[in-house]
Curated annotation (Swiss-Prot):
Record's subunit section: Homodimer.
Domain remarks: The N-terminal domain probably binds unfolded/aggregated proteins; the C-terminal domain interacts with ClpC.
Gene: mecA
Designated name of the protein: Adapter protein MecA
Entry's family note: Belongs to the MecA family.
HAMAP family the record matches: MecA
Function: Enables the recognition and targeting of unfolded and aggregated proteins to the ClpC protease or to other proteins involved in proteolysis.
Annotated PANTHER family: ADAPTER PROTEIN MECA, ADAPTER PROTEIN MECA 1
Pfam families named among the record's database cross-references: MecA
Superkingdom: Bacteria
GO molecular function list: protein-macromolecule adaptor activity
Amino acid sequence: MEIERINEDTIKFYISYLDLEERGFNQEDVWYDREKSEELFWDMMDELKYEEEFSPEGPLWIQVQALKHGLEVFVTKATIGGKGEDGFDVTLSSPDELAEEKIEKLLEENFNPVKKEALGDDDTLEFILEFRDFEDAISLSRATGLENLVTKLYSYQGKYYLNVEFPENKYDESNIDNAVSILLEYGLESNLTGYMLAEYGKVIFDVPALKQIRKHF
């Protein structure tokens, strides 16, 4: 498992599916077994105590992302208020019975992909594109077939990132695949999340970013 200190308040975990198996878990456990999900979470927090000076006390914002070869988990000290429904406000001081009940609810909401099946008409799918340099962003803005994308350009730690959303009322799976293929001609898929960019990045061009870049450059 990899542990990265993003900043004073945020830690990122990356655990590969192979590492999961070596720890006695499998993907089915993580997605559908709440007790196993909770056990994995506390294992990660216990390991964190030895790797980083990061106290999990107080409200936490926890975001889980499933990648091709593993799981990425962001743990941020924060007070959640109006941030949406992808996180859960949970105070952790020790793994006592009350905290475990809260973690159980947290993991059910964040690890269980079944909830994604209930997306409404206004929900969107998200993709983060990392550019090698700003010239690639300019080139992408002139590409065709991306007119209905919702895009916002950020600067974060010296790099440029495009937050791309696919409105579900305009993009089916085939259209999304085609759009992503075009996007990947100009950049790389990033492991960052829209939440991380919104919290810690700097907005260079707000929605619609590609249209504004094309207009100015």
